[in-house]
From Swiss-Prot:
The gene is MT-CYB. Keywords: Electron transport, Heme, Iron, Membrane, Metal-binding, Mitochondrion, Mitochondrion inner membrane, Respiratory chain, Transmembrane, Transmembrane helix, Transport, Ubiquinone. It comes from Pachyptila turtur (Fairy prion). Heme 1 (or BL or b562) is low-potential and absorbs at about 562 nm, and heme 2 (or BH or b566) is high-potential and absorbs at about 566 nm. This is Cytochrome b. SUPFAM superfamilies: a domain/subunit of cytochrome bc1 complex (Ubiquinol-cytochrome c reductase), Transmembrane di-heme cytochromes. The lineage of its organism: Eukaryota, Metazoa, Chordata, Craniata, Vertebrata. Signal peptide: none annotated. Heme b b562 binds at H84, H183.
Length: 380
């Protein structure tokens, strides 16, 4: 009998083991769809980004005009740009749901997979930040100035580091050029890290909503989950295209329709919505270095999650107190996101400070305590 090429060919064999014959738990829910959605987001962003890069000029005098030219004169340039800009929002929606799923169902106990995932998040955040600077509007310029300036809070080397990053004494042409280079490069790094992420995942196999070993009940990935993923793609592309076609600027900042002007500061400098929670934590601390450390900690705390797991059960499926705490954390993050979009004045300052304290308390203190408490409750 002739060998099956799908199973014998060195390259096809890898694809087969990852996407076709992969043994998958039969009970994984739609929360497990977000991984593949992130993959399709990445592919869409790389494709639209490549098409945009063909018409973009990384020069302070031409960047704004080149983006306007793309939207006005390039065939479907407006659509490509709108899909790329709003695609970033959907990328973050998916990654936040994906992290939330991992947190709720204890997927972080696959430490290597979790850690590569956190590195992926950090790389994605860096990519989105440098990408936001490229249209060279007011919010692009001032966002770049404010965020890069945070590095100057690092003792001794801070100022040197910032000027080195800028390529001068302020955000200018060298900054824009290197940000474009980074924005082009980083998505391919993300693609590489994704393969590492999947390699680690396939070492152990997928977790499932019950958090129990599922080796006795696995089904092939294709056709069951390929079909389920295609449904997921459809359900994601529908709101993405709706947003890109009907209200493409809904999530953007009107300030970015004004070309960058170093002499005029916008009344409210704020990042895109997906960074607002971290921005609110940064602003809630009056000290510059303290704010920067809190900002870094707000994301880096994810590396600690596997070590803070004290419960005997892996998932929160049968842990009602942890569930309650989880949804309080979600609400808290939404409050932080809202506060981050508001001006720095009473009552938003105190709300932001309380929400920031709550965020760290829930993750560092309450989750381990409640996990241990639920272990005690299992004995009664």
């Amino acid at each position: 009998m002739a060998p099956n090429l799908r199973k014998s060919h060195p390259l096809l064999k890898m694809v087969n083991n990852s996407l076709i014959d992969l043994p998958t738990p039969s009970n994984i829910s739609s929360w497990w769809n977000f991984g593949s959605l992130l993959g399709i987001c990445l592919m869409t962003q790389i494709l639209t980004g490549l098409l945009l890069a063909m018409h973009y000029t990384a020069d302070t005098t031409l960047a704004f005009s080149s983006v306007a030219h793309t939207c006005r004169n390039v065939q479907y340039g407006w659509l490509i740009r709108n899909l790329h800009a709003n695609g970033a929002s959907f990328f973050f929606i998916c990654i936040y749901f994906h992290i939330g799923r991992g947190f709720y169902y204890g997927s972080y106990l696959y430490k290597e997979t979790w850690n590569t995932g956190v590195i992926l998040l950090l790389t994605l955040m860096a990519t989105a930040f440098v990408g936001y600077v490229l249209p060279w509007g007011q919010m692009s310029f001032w966002g770049a100035t404010v965020i890069t300036n945070l590095f100057s809070a690092i003792p001794y080397i801070g100022q040197t580091l910032v000027e080195w990053a800028w390529g001068g004494f302020s955000v200018d042409n060298p900054t824009l050029t290197r940000f474009f280079a980074l924005h082009f490069l980083l998505p391919f790094l993300i693609a590489g890290l994704t393969l590492i992420h999947l390699t680690f995942l396939h070492e152990s196999g997928s977790n499932n909503p019950l958090g129990i070993v599922s080796n006795c009940d696995k089904i092939p990935f294709h056709p069951y989950f390929t079909l389920k993923d295609i449904l997921g793609f459809t359900l994601m592309f529908l709101p993405l295209t709706t947003l890109a076609l009907f209200s493409p600027n809904l999530l953007g900042d009107p300030e970015n329709f004004t070309p960058a002007n170093p002499l005029v500061t916008p009344p409210h400098i704020k990042p895109e919505w997906y960074f607002l929670f971290a921005y609110a934590i940064l602003r809630s601390i009056p000290n510059k270095l303290g704010g920067v450390l809190a900002l870094a900690a707000s994301v880096l705390i994810l590396f600690l999650i596997p070590f803070l797991h004290k419960a005997k059960q892996r998932t929160m499926t049968f842990r009602p107190i942890s569930q309650l705490l989880f949804w309080i954390l979600v609400a808290n993050l939404l409050i932080l996101t809202w506060v981050g979009s508001q001006p720095v004045e009473h009552p938003f300052i105190i709300i932001g400070q309380l929400a920031s304290i709550t965020y760290f308390t829930i993750l560092l203190v309450l989750f381990p305590i409640i996990g241990a408490l639920e272990n005690k409750m299992l004995n009664y």
